[in-house]
Amino acid sequence: GTMGTTQYHFGIYYDGCLAGVVCYGYFQAMNTNSGGHPYAPYVGVKYSKNGIQLSRGACVHWSHKHSGSKLISQSLKTMSQRGYKYTIAFSDPEAGEIGTIYQATNWYYLGIGVTKHYNIHFKKNDGIYLDARDLWKKHKMASKKAIEEWLKDKSGLYVKVSKPKGRYIKLMGNKKENKEMMKVLNPLIK
């Protein structure tokens, strides 16, 4: 897949060898059709600009089985110290992810996305040529019809619909801040 721009990177090491990494960065799902910040409906306007996205995480096969949980938990403490009040993360069913690590580290599940995303793939190896975000940035195309029209003279490429991703949120404020955010968030938790 593709990964958005990240600003913070944390690793877990065993005997000096890097065994896992998590990366945090800008929100990728920035639909502002409602007029405000896209996460204001989850945490309230007051805290909406104090969030960050866990963009990518991975551990090597030989790492301890709880390495991912420890890495996420410790990195979230650092992110909280840097002033972030919440973190958003996604699980990708196409990559076999069901959000187990988020459930293990006490995140709230917000359900799956409803927006269809169209990616362009190579016919030979099924690798992604352009994802939905790049299609919009480079060509201002989001509808399947427009993308298929654009692809007519480009052999070897085809459109594929991505499965919606699961969305999770972790509150990281102090007790009072988390209570305020929960007033907004509570009805949305699945």
Task: Identify the function of each model-found stretch.
Residues 1-5:
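Short loop/turn motifs at secondary-structure junctions and domain boundaries
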Residues 26-157:
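Acyl-donor binding region in acyl/amide transferases
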Residues 152, 162-163:
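Class I (Rossmann-like) S-adenosyl-L-methionine-dependent methyltransferase catalytic domain
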Residues 169-174:
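Short beta-strand-to-coil "C-cap" segments at the C-terminal boundary of structured domains/repeats
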Residues 180-190:
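Short, cationic low-complexity segments
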